[in-house]
Amino acid sequence: MKNVIVWMILTVWSIMNVTAGDTVYLFSYFINNSKDGLHLAYSYDGLTWTALNGGRSFLTPTVGKDKLMRDPSICQAPDGTFHMVWTSSWTDRIIGYASSRDLIHWSEQKAIPVMMNEPAAHNCWAPELFYDESSQTYYIFWATTIPGRHKEVPTSESEKGLNHRIYYV
């Protein structure tokens, strides 16, 4: 149940408001097990969604062992720049990063080594990016498994051996 609640919260946080005449919701997502890249959809009501770019990817992943672009999280900075982080591999200690002024043309992709100080870290999954206006600080939260560090609480057969905990920078 806790996993479902966390998933729902992270999904809602992934939706952001963009103003360009009318207010719309923008949703970033992945398809085909995330090797395809960044996909975007919009909605006026949060219920009916339309894929942008004909459903094609806006950005193909180039960083990480597996070159994935899973769980993309986009945040708009006060200067209008969009910053994005994503899961870049199944078993890497990095997350991907890129920025854009228009959500179409993206900067060179970079690997952020968020768990390099933890040699036993198994992964860095589902990063979420936030900007706190009061402190003018960006925060990135993600889930990582460090075998033997925390009690294992598998919620399904596929979760065996994983003990994800939330970390942030």
Predicted region positions:
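Carbohydrate-active catalytic/glycan-binding domains of CAZyme proteins
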Residues: V18-V169
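Positively charged n-region of N-terminal signal peptides that target proteins for export
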Residues: M1-V4
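Bacterial N-terminal signal peptides
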Residues: V6-I15
